[in-house]
Structures are given as structure tokens and as C-alpha cells.
Amino acid sequence: MARKDVASMFAAALFIGAFAAVPTSVQSIGVCYGVIGNNLPSRSDVVQLYRSKGINGMRIYFADGQALSALRNSGIGLILDIGNDQLANIAASTSNAASWVQNNVRPYYPAVNIKYIAAGNEVQGGATQSILPAMRNLNAALSAAGLGAIKVSTSIRFDEVANSFPPSAGVFKNAYMTDVARLLASTGAPLLANVYPYFAYRDNPGSISLNYATFQPGTTVRDQNNGLTYTSLFDAMVDAVYAALEKAGAPAVKVVVSESGWPSAGGFAASAGNARTYNQGLINHVGGGTPKKREALETYIFAMFNENQKTGDATERSFGLFNPDKSPAYNIQF
């Protein structure tokens, strides 16, 4: 997870109202598991913690053999990332993709419930040229190995969407995303999107209310283009991604929120109270979908642990639901 330069369009038309959303429980929610720390529990202890808390989805950011082994027969659904540094190699040839699949997927699947492979996370700049060929090569390699049930996608930053307010105006700002969206449509895979209301609120606190950013009542925003009403910034952001998919000619592609969370320390509005309010609200909310898509929205909270060796803003080290000793950073119910 990197700093999100969320488009400020949301600030243009937010106003205070009095309509509250009714939370709905979600059947399946995951948590992202990062390992950039020198004091974290063993992989097997982490899987046990997931199971004890009833967390039935996980995302890992590289083909971590220890984590994959620990996940065997756990039933936990997995997003398995290919590191951005490996994308160019996999994009270069189907044989490279086949080798990656043989080394990192075949030894574990189906004992490990690998649902999606993410061809990169928040890929930027010239490296985006590798996303589409890497996805194609991975699809071919999985199919050849008899593993076609595993879907290949990529995980995008929210700022891949331009004109994000109102949500119905959302459009992908980079042309390559149209090809990615259409490939996803052809394979039945979802688009993975990292969605962080925290950064939008942090950057526009005078225009976006804290309640609107944290699933609390008191704010209503109406999309004048389609009449849909929004009571949470999260919904507005997700529906902007759906609008962009429609404009790319891929209206049937589902969105999976591959990261979302709120820091408990280290920056503006980063507190245990706000983090708990947001993440509990997220868990309670996503089972009912968004105003545009009233169906359960598969969502992965960032992150399982506070990771003390992450670089960047201080908040980067404070997104964890749990401390390294496995105690909760704050109370939350799954």
C-alpha cells in the first residue's frame, strides 16, 4: 500500500445531510497480510490467528512459500500477488509465466484456496506496459496447467480513475486500462481496486466530513447524473470504478476491493478510534454492496499487522488490526 493521491473531485459537491445507511453483514471479508517487519509472528501462527478470528480471506504480496504452506487446508481464500519487480519477466514470455505457475501455484493448489493472482500492485509509469502481457501469459499458463479456475487480475490505485466525482463520471485515465478491463471481461475475472477514503479525507478535511469518510450517519451526497444517493465516501469511490469499467466496455466486470483501511497513528485523523470506526463500518457495510451494485462486495482490509519496517509516511506502519504480539490494536468484530 502506497500513499494515495486521491482526486479532489469528491470535495466539489459534498454537503451535510441526515440520511444514514443501514449496515449489512458480509459473508466473506479478507485481511491483507504484509511481512515488512522484524517482530511479526510465524506464518503458521498468523494462519491460526486468521482462523480463530473467523477471517476467511487473505492477500499476500509475493509468492511466500512459508505462508502458502501454512495455508494448506485452511479454507482461507487467497489473493496471491506477483511482485511488481517480476512483471516484466512474466510479460516477456509464456514460458516464464509457466515456470512461475509451476513453482508458485501448482505445488499448493487446491490445498491452498488461491482465488486470484494479482499481476502487480499499483503499478506505475512505464512498468504498466507489462501488465496486460503478463496477465495474458499467466492466463495461458494456468489454462495449460489445468488451473483455469484461478482468475488473473491486477490491483490498481484509485487514482487510475479520473473524474471520480460524481461517481457516474468515473473514467480510466490511462488507455491501457481499457484493454485490461476487456481482458477481465473475457475471462470472468474481477478488477482488484485499492480504495482508501482515509486519504481523500486527509487531503480535503474542510470539504469531506469525517462521518462520510467513516460510515457514520449525517452526510448525503446525490449523483445528479443518475439520482443515486451516497452516505459513505467508500461507496462513491467504488461506484466510480464501476462507472469507469462501463465506459471501458466492461460493464459486467466485478470489483473486488483489494485494500482498504484506516491508520491508527502517525498522521492527521489517524487514531485507534477512527480506525476502529472505519474498519468496523467497512465490515458491517460491504455485504449490502453499493448504490450502483446491490450485491456483496468482496473486500480486503489493509492490514493484519502494524509493520515496523515499512517506509514512507508514519501512517504506513500503523494500518494493522493487530500488534506483532497478536493482541488487537483495537477491538473489532468480524
Curated annotation (Swiss-Prot):
UniProt organism field: Hordeum vulgare (Barley)
Disulfide bonds: none
Transmembrane segments: none
One BP term from GO: (1->3)-beta-D-glucan catabolic process
Annotated EC: 3.2.1.39
Pfam families linked to this entry: Glyco_hydro_17
Function noted in UniProt: May provide a degree of protection against microbial invasion of germinated barley grain through its ability to degrade fungal cell wall polysaccharides. Hydrolyzes laminarin in vitro.
Reactions that this protein is recorded to catalyse: Hydrolysis of (1->3)-beta-D-glucosidic linkages in (1->3)-beta-D-glucans
PANTHER family assigned to the protein according to its UniProt record, in alphabetical order: GLUCAN ENDO-1,3-BETA-GLUCOSIDASE BG1-RELATED-RELATED
Keyword match Hydrolase: yes
Protein name: Glucan endo-1,3-beta-glucosidase GII
Keyword Manganese attached: no
Stated family: Belongs to the glycosyl hydrolase 17 family.
Active site, per annotation: E122 (proton donor), E259 (nucleophile)
UniProt xrefs under Gene3D superfamilies: Glycosidases (3.20.20.80)
Record keywords: Glycosidase, Hydrolase, Plant defense, Signal
Signal peptide extent: 1-28
pH-dependence of activity, as noted: Optimum pH is 4.5 (at 37 degrees Celsius).
GO molecular function term, any single one: glucan endo-1,3-beta-D-glucosidase activity
